[in-house]
Swiss-Prot record:
Assigned keywords, A-Z: Cell inner membrane, Cell membrane, Hydrolase, Lipid A biosynthesis, Lipid biosynthesis, Lipid metabolism, Manganese, Membrane, Metal-binding
Gene Ontology cellular-component terms listed: cytoplasm; extrinsic component of plasma membrane
Record membrane topology: Peripheral membrane protein
Pathway: Glycolipid biosynthesis; lipid IV(A) biosynthesis; lipid IV(A) from (3R)-3-hydroxytetradecanoyl-[acyl-carrier-protein] and UDP-N-acetyl-alpha-D-glucosamine: step 4/6
Keyword Manganese: yes
An example Gene Ontology biological process: lipid A biosynthetic process
Function: Hydrolyzes the pyrophosphate bond of UDP-2,3-diacylglucosamine to yield 2,3-diacylglucosamine 1-phosphate (lipid X) and UMP by catalyzing the attack of water at the alpha-P atom. Involved in the biosynthesis of lipid A, a phosphorylated glycolipid that anchors the lipopolysaccharide to the outer membrane of the cell.
UniProt-recorded name of the protein: UDP-2,3-diacylglucosamine hydrolase
Lineage: Bacteria, Pseudomonadati, Pseudomonadota, Gammaproteobacteria, Pasteurellales
Length: 234
């Protein structure tokens, strides 16, 4: 039976090699069973440009390339940590970059997919930050800085993000349900798949909509399998 896999929020980094091992294991054992793989953002804990080179980046690039060379399509939606992943990296591994919101047809079902950070509209500080860093001129400027400078900036942003989270309520960092319903009506879908919040679950709200939240990767992987039989985490 044909199936499609969805993953998100792996937050791969040199500091957590066990996550890379989990990813490699998934890519070599489970991923080849699918016809398509969707990565819904934050594959990397941070990304400072396609010109950066490291053992981690090479490993991920090779794993995705091996998958796409087998004829399995791989798609990527940017997360809040790796929104600077560019066409150079994507092309090097045969991966297709998708926009912030994308409608896909999954075995007869019309589904909206996204990373999920745009759904957290109650987090006003983050939404203001996102609006700034999504400006093309600012991204161009950042990507033309020396790698060492970019790395320092990324580390400062990451540390600030950790600090900010300790002062924010859980409710603020979760999706705004009214906005979720609004965006689903806008795209005329009743099924949504997203990540970002790390709260793996399948929310059934008949007859209105189904919202599937991908989990983050930690001690184990979080993989959503979609087939003609429906949705399940494996």
């Amino acid at each position: 039976m044909k199936k499609t896999f969805f993953i998100a929020d792996l937050h791969l980094s040199e500091n957590r090699p066990h996550l890379t091992e989990l990813f490699v294991h998934f890519m070599q054992t489970q991923a080849p069973q699918a016809e398509k793989l969707y990565i819904l953002g934050d594959l990397f804990d941070f990304w400072i440009g396609d010109d950066e080179q490291s053992a981690l980046i090479e490993t991920v690039q090779q794993q995705i390339l091996q998958l796409t060379q087998k004829g399995i399509s791989c798609y990527f939606i940017h997360g809040n940590r790796d929104f600077l992943v560019g066409r150079q990296f994507a092309n090097s591994c045969g991966m297709e970059l998708l926009p912030t919101y994308q409608i896909v047809n999954l075995y007869g079902k019309k589904v909206l997919i996204c990373h999920g950070d745009t759904l957290c509209t109650d987090d006003l500080a983050y939404q203001q930050y996102r609006k700034k860093v999504q400006q093309k001129w600012l991204q161009w400027l950042f990507l033309h800085l020396p790698l060492k400078v970019r790395l320092k900036i990324a580390e400062k942003i990451r540390q600030k993000s950790k600090t900010d989270k300790t002062h924010k309520s859980i409710e603020i960092m979760d999706v705004n349900k009214d906005f979720v319903e609004q965006i689903m009506q806008q795209f005329q879908v009743n099924i949504l798949i997203h990540g970002h919040t790390h709260k793996q679950n399948i929310h059934q709200n008949p007859p209105h909509f189904t919202r599937i939240v991908l989990g983050d990767w930690g001690a184990t992987a979080s993989v959503l399998e979609v087939s003609a039989n429906g949705f399940q985490f494996i």
